[in-house]
A protein has these predicted regions:
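Short beta->alpha connector loops at strand-helix junctions that form conserved
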Residues: 15-19
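Structured binding elements
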Residues: 10
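Short, well-ordered alpha-helical microsegments
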Residues: 1-3, 49-50
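Active-site phosphate-binding strand-loop segment of PLP-dependent enzymes
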Residues: 21-99, 104-114
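Active-site region of PLP-dependent enzymes
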Residues: 70-76, 83-190
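Surface-exposed charge patches
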Residues: 4, 54, 183
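Hydrophobic/aromatic ligand-binding patch that stacks against planar heteroaromatic rings
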Residues: 4-6, 79, 155
Length: 190
């Protein structure tokens, strides 16, 4: 899915290897692939294990964090998905929180958030989704781009919020399952 997002945005995905112990990319595995053509770095916080972000941020590129598998994971005192330029979360059925389909975005960049809001609702300009603009002449808005509707419905959003409130319980169960796998597979020489 990460590669798809890059391709759909008109970019070229350049893959790098991962660390054998964490299954995450590292600054060392990313570095050989940085070039004058690099526009951003996308990292995946895999299986709840955060990517070491400081070395990745030191490249000076925008960093997109896929934090779908690390919704409640922290690096220091910062949650995964809140460290880079943009955090993205898939709510697919196999992710830590599911709404059936869909996802979420976090960013501190107001221009990027405005653009994300425009794109999620058929490319409607910012006045089309601001509550103040909806009170009068709500039918007047600009279409600034052509894009499919990507808004979650209320039922899906409610399911996601209910699961978010139970994230600690979910993580405890996942850790128990992880420990069972670790114990059962410990004797295998990989």
């Amino acid at each position: 899915a990460c590669a798809h997002a890059i391709i759909l945005a008109g970019g070229i995905s350049v893959f790098c290897d991962v660390d054998v112990n964490t299954q995450n990319v590292t600054a060392d595995t990313i570095a050989p692939h940085i070039s004058s053509k690099t526009r951003a770095i996308m990292v995946v916080h895999y299986a709840g294990k955060p990517v070491r972000m400081e070395p990745v941020l030191s490249f000076g590129q925008p960093v997109i964090e896929d934090a779908a598998q690390a919704v409640d994971s922290k690096l220091g005192n910062k949650y995964c998905g809140s460290i880079g330029t943009i955090g993205v979360y898939s709510f697919d059925p196999v992710k830590n929180i599911t709404t059936g389909e869909g996802g979420g975005i976090t960013t501190r960049d107001s221009e990027l958030m405005t653009r994300a809001r425009q794109l999620r609702y058929c490319g409607i300009g910012s006045a089309g989704f601001e509550a103040a603009a909806m009170k009068e002449r709500w039918w007047e808005y600009d279409i600034v781009d052509v894009f499919p509707k990507l808004l979650p419905n209320d039922i899906a959003a409610s399911i996601g919020l209910a699961q978010l409130r139970k994230i600690d319980k979910f993580q405890t169960i996942r850790k128990k399952i992880w420990n069972i796998y670790q114990a059962q597979l410990a004797d295998f020489d990989w």
